[in-house]
């Protein structure tokens, strides 16, 4: 596919742009390191099978190729800190169905709480929500890979 399926969602529903602007401010204070936000976004892109999200995160990353290449196998990779592992585990729990029980167990939350303050956990939750907001637009609207939403959907 060479062009998006939907040229500009905001022209059909202007509140889409307002919501996008609001959710994009979730980490504007820099509570979480940009590198962590990129790793989480990259993992979500991989989990939902979105070339757009995966390429976007890789394009914004200022990390080593080894770490970026190992995100899908973070559990067995030596490249990630315990805090990053906790964030990636939360990311997978939130974005992967669990037919046998709750997605975020008490044990998983407790592990994350060892590495993040309550504020950081709320911001991480917001980052996951921000990404979650854009997933349907990326999967249904099929934006061009390597081009930002804003750049291609300004019509």
Where would I find each of the regions flagged by the language model?
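Acidic, glycine/proline-rich low-complexity segments that act as flexible tails and inter-domain linkers
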Residues: 1-38, 58-62, 66, 145-155
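A ubiquitous short alpha-helical element
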Residues: 2-11, 73-80, 90-97
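Short acidic alpha-helix initiation/capping motifs at coil-to-helix transition points
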Residues: 14-20, 49-51, 98-106
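Short, thiol/selenol-centered motifs that function as redox-active sites or metal-ligating centers
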Residues: 37-60
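Short alpha-helical scaffolding segments that buttress acidic/His motifs in well-ordered protein cores
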Residues: 39-44, 71-72, 87-95, 122-135
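Helix-adjacent hinge/juxtasegments
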Residues: 57-91
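Acidic/histidine-rich alpha-helical segments that form the ligand environment
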Residues: 79-127
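Preference for long, well-ordered alpha-helical segments
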Residues: 118-155
């Amino acid at each position: 596919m060479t062009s998006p399926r939907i040229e500009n969602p905001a022209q059909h529903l202007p509140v889409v742009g307002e919501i996008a602007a609001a959710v994009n401010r979730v980490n504007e204070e820099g509570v979480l390191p940009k590198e962590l936000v990129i790793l989480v976004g990259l993992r979500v892109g991989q989990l939902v099978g979105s070339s757009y999200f995966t390429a976007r995160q890789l394009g914004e990353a200022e990390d080593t190729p080894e770490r970026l290449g190992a995100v899908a196998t973070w559990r067995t990779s030596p490249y990630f800190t315990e805090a990053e592992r906790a964030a990636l585990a939360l990311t997978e729990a939130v974005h992967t169905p669990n037919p046998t029980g709750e997605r975020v167990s008490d044990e998983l939350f407790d592990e994350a709480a060892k590495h993040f303050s309550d504020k950081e956990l709320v911001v991480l939750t917001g980052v996951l929500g921000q990404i979650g907001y854009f997933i349907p637009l990326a999967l249904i609207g099929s934006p061009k890979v390597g081009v930002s939403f804003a750049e291609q959907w300004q019509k």
